[in-house]
């Protein structure tokens, strides 16, 4: 299917549903890039399998993988997880996959954004991203949905929506000169409103400290439900994350969402800080743009979790804050099963569980009134 549409979601009455709305499936991609995943990806692959297995308790999972690694992925993954052959340059499905929109008549369509590996020639993380840029349309073809081609360089991890007209993002990412330098903030807001059918955009200044995506919002905060957000907090005034988190809290505490609500802010602890060890910097192909260094600060965050039907899948790091984060998430989602998955090796690649997943909503999404 995957026929191109020349209108827009707003014009056609489609909106991006929130992550807490019903999902048909979750898509992931197999990690094999040897300049990003040490020892040919074997450590990360084990954690991707664990994440997928956790998700599969409540939601169907589809993996994409190139032809060379198809058998490897198929053998490693449980039988109930679908594996299909679609190549990509790396495995960040949140950023390269389709962003789906739905209407109240049970129809679904897909947005394909432009992708430039988090910065293109200015500060992108790799030199060739043509395969990544083709994933969204191929994904929509498999799910059987028409496609809007949005004229905006945008990664899925740079936005969160509440499903009721509010979008959250960061100035650090969306206004970065490596994304859409020809567009003003107002231009970008207009395009987000047209292609996601949102009414109000709440801008945080920065994302998590040392986040190589230029500060994706999904690594510092998450939408729990309309009017309620979770945010990574920092209590160490000597940590560079401290000022970032306090500034974000100030913005969110003063914000009014699209429905006129003030926001409840649930604070998540910050793990660590965590750093790349000597062993973790070894056994990587050399790369100018993704040169992992011993002692490099890792952008670890419990906010980088996935809501999927009746489960919450969140990253753990072997830190004392893991259990505290689980308790906070369980209180925030009392009717969900909260599943922690050890994800340090995913973190070493530059993201975490939310970054490596992309949900496909049910066609019969909840009607917003």
Swiss-Prot record:
EC number(s) on file: 3.5.3.12
Cross-referenced Gene3D superfamilies: L-arginine/glycine Amidinotransferase, Chain A (3.75.10.10)
Molecular function terms from GO: agmatine deiminase activity; protein-arginine deiminase activity
Enzyme class: hydrolase
Gene Ontology biological process terms, A to Z: putrescine biosynthetic process
Database matches in Pfam families: PAD_porph (PF04371)
Methyltransferase as UniProt keyword: no
Domain of life per record: Bacteria
UniProt keyword annotation of Hydrolase present: yes
Active site annotation, chain numbering: 355
InterPro entries found in the cross-reference section: Agmatine_deiminase, Peptidyl-Arg-deiminase_porph
Catalytic reactions on record: agmatine + H2O = N-carbamoylputrescine + NH4(+)
Protein keywords: Hydrolase
Entry-linked HAMAP family: Agmatine_deimin (MF_01841)
Family statement drawn from the similarity comment of this UniProt entry: Belongs to the agmatine deiminase family.
The name this protein goes by in its record: Putative agmatine deiminase
Gene source species: Marinomonas sp. (strain MWYL1)
């Amino acid at each position: 299917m995957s026929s191109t549409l020349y209108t827009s979601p707003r014009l056609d009455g489609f909106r991006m549903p929130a992550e807490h709305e019903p999902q048909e499936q979750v898509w992931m991609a197999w990690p094999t890039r040897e300049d990003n995943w040490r020892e040919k990806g074997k450590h990360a692959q084990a954690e991707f399998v664990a994440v997928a297995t956790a998700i599969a308790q409540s939601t169907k999972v589809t993996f994409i993988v190139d032809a060379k690694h198809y058998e490897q992925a198929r053998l490693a993954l449980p039988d109930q997880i679908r594996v299909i052959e679609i190549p990509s340059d790396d495995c960040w499905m949140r950023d390269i996959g389709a962003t789906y929109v739905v209407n109240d008549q049970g129809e679904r369509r897909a947005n394909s954004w432009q992708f430039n590996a988090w910065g293109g020639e200015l500060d992108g993380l790799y030199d060739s991203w043509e395969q990544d840029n083709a994933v969204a349309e191929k994904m929509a073809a498999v799910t059987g949905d028409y496609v809007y081609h949005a004229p905006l360089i945008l990664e899925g991890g740079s936005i969160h929506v509440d499903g009721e007209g509010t979008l959250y993002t960061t100035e650090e990412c969306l206004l970065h000169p490596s994304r859409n330098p020809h567009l003003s903030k107002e231009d970008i807001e207009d395009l987000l409103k047209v292609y996601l059918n949102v009414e109000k955009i709440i801008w945080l200044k920065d994302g998590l400290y040392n986040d190589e995506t230029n500060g994706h919002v999904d690594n510092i905060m998450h939408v729990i439900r309309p009017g309620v957000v979770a945010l990574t907090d920092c209590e160490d005034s000597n940590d560079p994350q401290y000022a970032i988190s306090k500034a974000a809290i100030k913005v969110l505490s003063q914000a009014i969402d699209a429905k006129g609500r003030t926001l409840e802010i649930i604070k998540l602890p910050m793990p660590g800080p965590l750093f790349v060890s000597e062993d973790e910097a070894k056994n990587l192909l050399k790369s100018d743009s993704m040169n992992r260094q011993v002692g490099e600060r890792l952008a670890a965050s419990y906010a980088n979790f996935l809501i999927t039907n009746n489960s919450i899948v969140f990253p753990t790091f072997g830190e004392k804050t893991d259990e505290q984060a689980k308790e906070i998430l369980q209180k925030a989602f009392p009717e969900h099963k909260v599943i922690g998955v050890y994800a340090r090796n995913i973190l070493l690649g530059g993201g975490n569980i939310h970054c490596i997943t992309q949900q496909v909503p049910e066609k019969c999404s909840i009607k917003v009134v």
